[in-house]
Amino acid sequence: EPGHDVQLLGVIRPGEPAGEMSLIADAPHSADVVALRDSEIIAVPRDVFLEACEADTAVMIELAKLMMLRSRQAVTRGGAGEPSVFGFISLGSGLLRPLVDRLAREIAGLGYSVTAIGSEVQSAPTEWFSDVERTHDFVLYVAEAPDSGWRHLVARQVDRLFHVGRGDRNPPRSGAGAAAALASPLQAQQLVDLILLHTPDTSRPSGSEAWLDVARPARLFHLRRDHDADIARMARILTGQSVGLVLSGGGARAYAHIGAVRALRERGVPIDFLGGVSMGAVVAAGVAMGWGDAEMERRIREAFVTTSPLDDIAVPLLAMTHGMKVNERLAHHFGDVQIADLWLPFFCVSSNLTTGAYQVHRRGLLREALRASISLPGVLPPATSDNNVLVDGAVLKNFPADVMRASQLGPIV
């Protein structure tokens, strides 16, 4: 609608109809259809369709099933479907094919049929690409050469696109801009992600904010070369088996999250995405920082249990405390780490009193996002950001499982 952001309602797969509701109701279309990939369309006149329905009632029954399925998907916002064809486009120099081949082997180890394809098939006919999709569970296209024709072809053949850059270098602004332009239909639907590659000895990523500004990805992933756990995590993400952990607020009760994280680790359950609210956000941030069980317990106890961070009592104009001790402890334990520089994708939620809606923090200083998420009204002074007043996320959304679902397709704990 005019004045509103574009919203993805669903994905029409090969062989499925588009515009069936408008055809049956003999009314104008209620949405636009955008070709994310190279497509061939067959137009069926209304009278021909009605004749087919009269000749075989199964046509209308199957169409009704599809319409009901799409209606449910629109309500649950689950219409994007599960992608099975992925593209990997290199930003800058560096070999990309070995990484994609390794991802393919990892996916095959999960029991799927998968193939990795490079520019050697650039001149193949359209039918060939369709046949590859039909005969494999997952298809991975690789574009690492400077051949713009192959890059454009990859962007027109995939369900989801990954730009791949080197995390130890600044983003190549011209290359990233060209990549964003060729992926514009996918980019508009938030179907373009960014992978930053790091050396095996990298302790923590840095400078990721610059990459976000240039590439404008829907999601950011960090991978260390030759790091088995990172490759396995990426394979789970591609196959829809990634695990998202969401931790709610609840004050002192949120300390139970530490035990929950430990139990998941003891059971060998991977944690691939993290999100949280209030104290749950603090614990989730610790996991994203890479804290082990012992370090997590020590830091949380030191910051919030051994001595109270809420004993800097203030004249209660804004809150009962000044909030300075909380600020100091967040700074001590999380430093100047940016959310984009965490090894695992992370978000936390605060309540925006200015707009009356919850606010999701995926960028910026981690400690500032946490400070907003734990700002319990009346106890801590509210946080401010861009002239917005932010308080504890639990005020409006204490369990943001739906936010996590929008980020990944796998199980959510």
Predicted segments with their positions:
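Conserved substrate/cofactor phosphate-moiety recognition/catalytic segment
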Residues: 101-134
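Gly/Ala-rich beta-loop-alpha elbow adjacent to hydrolase catalytic centers
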Residues: 276, 280
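Glycine-rich phosphate-binding P-loop
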Residues: 82-109, 115
